[in-house]
From Swiss-Prot:
UniProt motif Nuclear localization signal: location: 261-265
Official protein name in the record: Early E1A protein
Motif range (PXDLS motif, CTBP-binding): 255-259
Complexes and interactors: Interacts with host UBE2I; this interaction interferes with polySUMOylation. Interacts with host RB1; this interaction induces the aberrant dissociation of RB1-E2F1 complex thereby disrupting the activity of RB1 and activating E2F1-regulated genes. Interacts with host ATF7; the interaction enhances ATF7-mediated viral transactivation activity which requires the zinc binding domains of both proteins.
Signal peptide: none
UniProt function note: Plays a role in viral genome replication by driving entry of quiescent cells into the cell cycle. Stimulation of progression from G1 to S phase allows the virus to efficiently use the cellular DNA replicating machinery to achieve viral genome replication. E1A protein has both transforming and trans-activating activities. Induces the disassembly of the E2F1 transcription factor from RB1 by direct competition for the same binding site on RB1, with subsequent transcriptional activation of E2F1-regulated S-phase genes and of the E2 region of the adenoviral genome.
Taxonomic lineage: Viruses, Varidnaviria, Bamfordvirae, Preplasmiviricota, Tectiliviricetes
Entry's Gene Ontology cellular component terms: host cell nucleus
Protein origin, superkingdom: Viruses
Region feature (Disordered): 193-244
One annotated GO molecular function: zinc ion binding
InterPro entries (alphabetical): Aden_E1A
Length: 266
């Protein structure tokens, strides 16, 4: 029995070797030239298995992308390319609607250089100045539309259009305008405007329609003391009891000696 088993194993091994040898020598798997059946590991490592170049390789690569070729090798099903069907309603093209597309690039680029930062800061300053000018013009236009008017009522803070304007804009019902505040706190004396004086006849020209400056009618008294310029004396100024003592003329009886030094008063 043991002898029969060894013979069967030997026959199976021979059959397997013949099958492998026949498969290697078929036309689909030709043996490369210069390759013997008994090849060493070094010879198998240097074996050139590239084969001949395919003339249609570039054309195929140009038609099909790498993803499609890889999917074909891996057996992955690729979705069919969209192909428009026949036009509906005849050969006329459908009416297309315009669409706005955002073509702005939101990616962060390289940091700006020093010159670009200077230009950017200048542009930013000009933009802020333009915005401030526009805001000021808009505020002035709003003020003109609100029609602010200065008012002076008989009772400060009551029935005043200026106070009503400030109360409406600020939202505070107890606020007063500047004029009513000064009048209410007696900071200044306000009185009604007096009537204009009648025009006096002009004494310099024959035209009586134009007024002349008022005439001085009050004559000063004869004994009115007048200030007299007095030179500074080297001595100490004497004490006085009233202002009249300073403006009285002092009689100079002794001549001044200019050769002497001025005495210092302690």
């Amino acid at each position: 029995m043991r002898h029969l088993a060894l013979e069967m194993i030997s026959e199976l091994l021979d059959l397997g070797l013949d099958t492998i040898d026949g498969w290697l020598h078929t036309e689909f798997r030709p043996v490369p030239a210069g390759v013997s059946h008994n090849m060493s590991l070094h010879e198998m490592y240097d074996l050139d298995v590239t084969g001949q170049e395919d003339e249609n390789e570039e054309a195929v690569d140009g038609v099909f992308s790498d993803a499609m070729l890889l999917a074909a090798e891996e057996g992955i099903e690729m979705p069919n390319l969209y192909s428009p069907g026949p036009l509906v309603g005849g050969g006329e093209m459908p009416e297309l609607q315009p669409e706005e597309e955002d073509l702005f690039c939101y990616e962060d680029g390289f940091p700006p250089s020093d010159s670009e930062e200077g230009e950017h800061s200048q542009v930013e300053t000009e933009r802020k100045m333009a915005e401030a000018a526009a805001a000021g013009a808009a505020a002035a236009a709003r003020r003109e539309q609100d029609d602010f008017r200065l008012d002076c009522p008989s009772v400060p803070g009551h029935g005043c259009s200026s106070c009503d304007y400030h109360r409406k804009t600020s939202g505070c019902p107890e606020i007063l305008c500047s004029l009513c505040y000064l009048r209410a706190n007696s900071m200044f004396i306000y009185s009604p405007v007096s009537d204009s004086e009648p025009d006096e006849p002009d004494s310099t020209t024959a035209d009586s329609n134009h007024g002349s400056p008022p005439t001085l009618r009050c004559t000063p008294p004869r004994d009115l003391p007048r200030p007299v310029p007095v030179k500074a004396s080297p001595g100490k100024r004497p004490a006085v009891n009233s202002l009249h003592d300073l403006i009285e003329e002092v009689e100079q009886t002794v001549p001044l000696d200019l050769s002497l030094k001025r005495s210092r008063s302690n």
